[in-house]
Amino acid sequence: MGTRRDVRFVSSGVKLPCADAAPAPAPAPTLLSAALPFARIGRAIDGVVRHVARSLPRLPVARAETGAGAAAAPIALPRRQKDGGGGGGGEERVLISEVAVRGKDGEPLERPELEAAAAAALRACRPNAALTVREVQEDVHRVVESGLFRSCMPVAVDTRDGIRLVFEVEPNQDFHGLVCEGANMLPSKFLEDAFHDRHGKIINIRHLDQVIKSVNGWYQERGLTGLVSYAEILSGGILRLQVSEAEVNNINIRFLDRRTGEPTVGKTQPETILRHLTTKKGQAYNRAQVKRDVETILTMGIMEDVTIIPQPVGDSNKVDLVMNLVERPSGGFSAGGGISSGITNGPLSGLIGSFAYSHRNVFGRNKKLNLSLERGQIDSIFRLNYTDPWIDGDNKRTSRTIMVQNSRTPGTLIHGGDHPDHGPITIGRVTAGIEYSRPFRPKWSGTLGLIFQHAGARDDKGNPIIRDFYNSQLTASGNAYDDTLLAKLESVYTDSGDRSSTMFVFNIEQGLPILPEWLSFNRVTARLRQGYEIGPARLLLSASGGHVEGNFSPHEAFAIGGTNSVRGYEEGAVGSGRSYAVGSGEVSCRMFGPLEGVVFGDYGSDLSSGPKVPGDPAGARGKPGSGYGYGVGVRVDSPLGPLRLEYAFNDKQARRFHFGVGYRN
């Protein structure tokens, strides 16, 4: 054992070395309970008091002093007084002429401060006081409970001047070191800070009791199952603490029938569930960590209910975790509706219907298959997605999505609405790609993808066209279709799911001209949203912007204006350009129930980049290139997200209704 005065972990314990070389610690008679450090001492006190109770009333002489004026043999006590007060309950009182504190051998203590501490603990025992046995008993308890003494024996001595009451005390040992066993998770610095100034001082049981409580509190605050189960003072002034931490033994999965609640055979592979758990076999049992694991399993989307029940394993400190799982139906058909941008006149921008089939647990491995068809008056989208939320063999939680899509969307965002001599333009796209996503830092996630797109414009009869009514080109290559191979990189930051939180999205897309006729361009976009709580109201600020450089299709330009851009304008009516910037501010306040009122203002600009788009579609249609809008609206919470109905004015004093589902982008 070294001479350093610090705390350090040795094997599974913590040791505070002695200041001087000390003999190997061996258990001393003093044992302390973790739950009540004074329990054993209290029992000893009770035994002493019972002895005093037997001796004082008959012969309160435990030891006769010798010398001049002192009797060598016990003598009878003076006449006792009856306790007439209610507190004594009729007990006899003995008049005490002197009260003293001495060591166990009857000699004065070497440390005057210890004698003073014992004397200060006395309440009833004072010179010239008539005392009962109960009052002496209470003062004995007070002396021991001061934490500095391992024993206290009251001794009555008959002297020439009367009865002398001597409290013979035995101080605790000086503190020279600490051994803490079983504390695998408790930081060593925690005990260093608790005992760094205790070297060479009397071991104070009160201080030790506070340390034990703080250790137990450390585990409780962190959701850990652990406590100090045993404490003792070894010879040489060494404290020994035994910490018991619950350890996870096994994790067992049990599937329950969603109707009867009885055990059944599950469709999900057990390893698919276990790999999502942060709680592992051999770790300390952490209630907070287990709760997070339950939430993680629920977010997989394949379970209806999840509970984890700890069960003790025999007399050990280990627990088995039994996970009860109720599976959701794996797949099925669904139908619904939504909002389309195909019709841009009137309070509603158009309705679309949808039909989908989904399987959320393919092969019992939480893989997702989605097949959907959406159809509106102009819009139509056929989409096939296959997603593996966590690739097998990967330890970074990387997901993979394979996508095939065939869509037809209105070209009104860039190329305007219907013309008397020219029907509506639609943009047809056939897209296929693969994307990989993973979290790479807390609150940050990233996506890397490769996407091929075959896109072109069509007239109202479905025939390919390369120029519109204004003779503006509709493709970059001059062919009926443009082919593009895009490499995509996206980074997303979110600090929570609350609307008052921060969100930042940064996206880069690069066209790869593998073949000469494939387009080559670079597109950069960014979006930022920040919310603030201001009393009962909420302020939401958002900004977005982007730029495209290179040879790109006109329909890939940034469209400004509309429900998710500058309200008060029709979709794409402010402008379309190679660059854009849009800012928005909203103040919302809860009115009653699920209804929320909002006041907003938007501004957007193409940053004078409209003429740089191939064919200058914005200039041909007289779009201003910049504009602002403001208005009021209401929102209603729904299972689909907030339903938004807004009434806005623009800087041309035109007014317009906007209806949307979900939060603005």
Swiss-Prot record:
Signal sequence bounds: none
PROSITE patterns reported in the protein's UniProt record: POTRA
InterPro entries assigned to the protein according to its UniProt record, in alphabetical order: Bac_surfAg_D15, BamA/TamA_POTRA, D15-like, POTRA
Record-annotated disulphide pairs: none
Tree of life domain: Eukaryota
Subcellular location: Plastid, Chloroplast outer membrane
Coiled-coil ranges per UniProt: none
Any matching Pfam family: Omp85
Name the record gives this protein: Outer envelope protein 80, chloroplastic
Annotated GO CC locations: chloroplast outer membrane; membrane
Domain POTRA: 246-328
